[in-house]
From Swiss-Prot:
The gene is PGIC1. Keywords: Cytoplasm, Gluconeogenesis, Glycolysis, Isomerase. This is Glucose-6-phosphate isomerase, cytosolic 1. Belongs to the GPI family. Coiled coil: none annotated. One of its GO terms (cellular component) is cytosol. Its EC number is 5.3.1.9. The active site is at residues 360, 391, 516. The keyword Cytoplasm applies. GO terms for biological process: gluconeogenesis; glucose 6-phosphate metabolic process; glycolytic process. Pathway: Carbohydrate degradation; glycolysis; D-glyceraldehyde 3-phosphate and glycerone phosphate from D-glucose: step 2/4. InterPro entries: G6P_Isomerase (IPR001672), G6P_Isomerase_C (IPR023096), Phosphoglucose_isomerase_CS (IPR018189), SIS_dom_sf (IPR046348), SIS_PGI_1 (IPR035476), SIS_PGI_2 (IPR035482). GO terms for molecular function: carbohydrate derivative binding; glucose-6-phosphate isomerase activity; monosaccharide binding.
Amino acid sequence: MASPALISETEAWKDLKAHLEGIKMIHLRELMGDTERCQSMMVEFDNIFLDYSRQQASPDTISKLYKLADAAHLKQKIDRMYNGDHINSTENRSVLHVALRAPRNSAICSDGKNVVPDVWNVLDKIKDFSDRVRNGSWIGATGKELKDVIAVGIGGSFLGPLFVHTALQTDPEASKNARGRELRFLANVDPIDVARNISGLNPETTLVVVVSKTFTTAETMLNARTLREWISSALGPSAVAKHMVAVSTNLPLVEKFGIDPNNAFAFWDWVGGRYSVCSAVGVLPLSLQYGFAVVEKFLQGAHSIDQHFSSAPFEKNIPVLLGLLSVWNVSFLGYPARAILPYSQALEKLAPHIQQVSMESNGKGVSIDGLPLPFESGEIDFGEPGTNGQHSFYQLIHQGRVIPCDFIGIVKSQQPVYLKGEVVNNHDELMSNFFAQPDALAYGKTPEQLKNENVSEHLIPHKTFTGNRPSISILLPTLDAYRIGQLLAIYEHRVAVQGFVWGINSFDQWGVELGKSLATQVRKQLHASRVKGEPVEGFNFSTKTLLTRYLEATSDVPADPSTLLPNI
């Protein structure tokens, strides 16, 4: 029986490899001089404008990328995802985060069952609960309104909701709805994170949302037990039922923990953690802070891109184009990283979230059939809002390693500022940099230009910019809840396109398991050493040395301590 073919074995891949050498000889200065080419590399959907003309690609490159998509059966794979097929083959699961934002009357099936009614049952439950908390009909154990929320989760249970929360904080409608309320996220098992989260909060007015599908995630459950103790020590054990709710499917463990199972909000195996922000994982805490109506607009924005992704032809399909260009940059041009550069402080948590979505999804070394990949896949994602990043790592991007960049601009600021007598307003100053940076990267500055400017000879090498550094520009009209949902879905589907073309499973994450299992061994050793005084055994010399040093330096830690909570 023949082995399954890798995408790199197809004629389309080989054709792009042959095409590569010619493209590498053409500088972006020359490519950008072709107006017809540039016009062909601009796409608009629902007033979202994508300009990918500053990619190291010709129209012929793009045509060949479409052929690569066909060779990878991209359209069929997208359809299979929407049809609920078990495309997460290693875990035998559907991948249906699109169902989380589907309209109530939609039909999206997993294993022959329409899951949309289940989704809306949970959404209706969230709306009812969040409305009651916000209007004061659900109160705490001492009769006070619950104005503060701590969401406890890690990974996808944290990064996505934090991104959306941060983006909504300065939106006029959302910020008005959030007045007098506080939403915090507790993720790290580091006790410092606990201290910072409870600092300044009153247990009487605090609601804790514990997010864990199985209710067994080690870090999350330790943090949840810590906050349970914080509440119980102040208000008594019975207060837990009024001050803690869960996002989980393990109702027996939820009840055992002390949370009423009626106050547990479900999500499903077909929702991956990093794709779960549109489930109760994100919708519950965000609705408590901003009201369900705002969050529903966010879901509608994501759904609009879901429809666009599934129906638009490749040449007009924003996630498909972005995904194919990433494959081109990574696997052919050899650029291992990508900078996500939103020119909006509201999007300061976009890059950390997409870092997880992308790197946990596509950080794989084998195909979906288990074959080692003979080409580079996956990207190292990082980023910072402009203009902060310009004063941080742009030096390397301009004159060091070539790193393709995503520039994201917003036409109308959430919070405009105008000062009389200034040459431009604050947002125009920001956007001046948004428009300038892609050209600086593409065109650079030659030694000849510097000579014409009478730059000293010895400084010319230091002031030369090679240019020819690719980027894309995305221009959004506003940054309200709807547009935030669209931006999220664009990046989610872009990641899926890359994985579909590379032929990998973008929806499992076995790479996180080994470290967790080794941590279990260390945890047992720490307990044995502290409680029984046992020496460190069963580890390599390096780990044994480090562990022994740590235990000796913390020998004053009691083996069976009394409860001690942060005091800050």
